Amino acid sequence: PREVVRLVLALKVNSLARGYSGVRWTVIETLLACLERDVLPAIPGQGSVGASGDLAPLAHLAAALIGVGDAVAGGRRLPATEALNAAGIALLELRAKEGLALLNGTQVSTALALRGLVGAEDVLAASLVAGALTIEAALGSITPFDARIHAVRGHASQSDVAAAVLRLIEGSEINESHRDCGRVQDPYSLRCIPQVLGACLRTLRDAAAILVDEANAVSDNPLVFPAGDGAGDVISGGNFHAEPVALVADALAVAIAEIGNISERRCALLVDPTFSQLPAFLATDPGLESGYMIAQVTAAALASENKGLAHPASVDSIPTSAGQEDHVSMATHGARRLDDMLRNAANIVAVELLSAARGIAFRRPLRTSAALEAVLAEIAPDGGGTGDRYLSPEIERVAALVRAGRFTPLVAQLFPTTAR
């Protein structure tokens, strides 16, 4: 994707500009010109094992700069020479070390992981909003979100999630209407939102710290350490090994799977009248209509698919280069699959958002909080509709809002990259 390639170029500039890669300024200036004029090398997403850097994908970047292969400019894929010439960018004539400096590095896997991190923040934010709506629709208790419970466990992210849910529900007539009910303990998918999504939030925060380190890293090899007067050392090491990115990508994958898992369980809870005290499957005429039955089945299918996709990529090392590269990270594959997982998770959360909106419609004329009413007005202005209907376009529309970060501002203070 265009935004990933732009990030790859920016990360490569940042690494080379540190001054340890033995390249001329003209190499960096050419990369910057490509960014400024939006001439982007055509880089494949596959072909890297995440050690010796992202060699194959970055080879396509380097090739374009010398006029080999293709580039994308103005939305069109062109021969690289044609694209560069049209933009007034001179072809690079590489000198010693410069080709290797362009090929070596973790920029592709890091760019993909950063994209996955931002996407995970958006899905987690939407999941918190969906969870708050489900609490309202199912007449769930907010007692388990009491700050004292979370303070004694000592996990800041857990406390932060609990506080965020309380803020979302604050001022709700629905919540006030059952304050003195006899319900003692809700199912874990409601009661343990702070514990589950708080742990996911901690994973995202930790991932951000590691990826920021990697974004500012010199992951070339060998490295050049000048000592002045033209002297210095050229040292071969292993900074190209993307294990930090691989482990982060795997952690993000597990977190994304868990966000989808708990959201799907709340979808199941909403269509079950035994707990929700709502019509079966949220149907206007239960028994005659299916309501949200198949929407929940879809959410279950996507949650299970994500469980398979969450298998750690980093444990699947495979030797390459006649055994010289005998341990590799698989970081690029691990980071690339995050997009598929995020798409699935966004669809699951969209099903929950729509299901909860339908449930709240049955609680009218009581209103939820001002913040959640604004969400309802956007996702389901008709209250989730009546009768059986074609739900796919609605799910896709709300999932697109999730992926676009529409709900993230409601809980933006939680996330490490909210300055984006």
Residue locations for each model-derived region?
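A broadly conserved amphipathic alpha-helix scaffold signal in soluble, globular proteins
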Residues: 29-36, 56-63, 125
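C-terminal auxiliary extensions adjacent to catalytic cores
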Residues: 37-38, 64-420
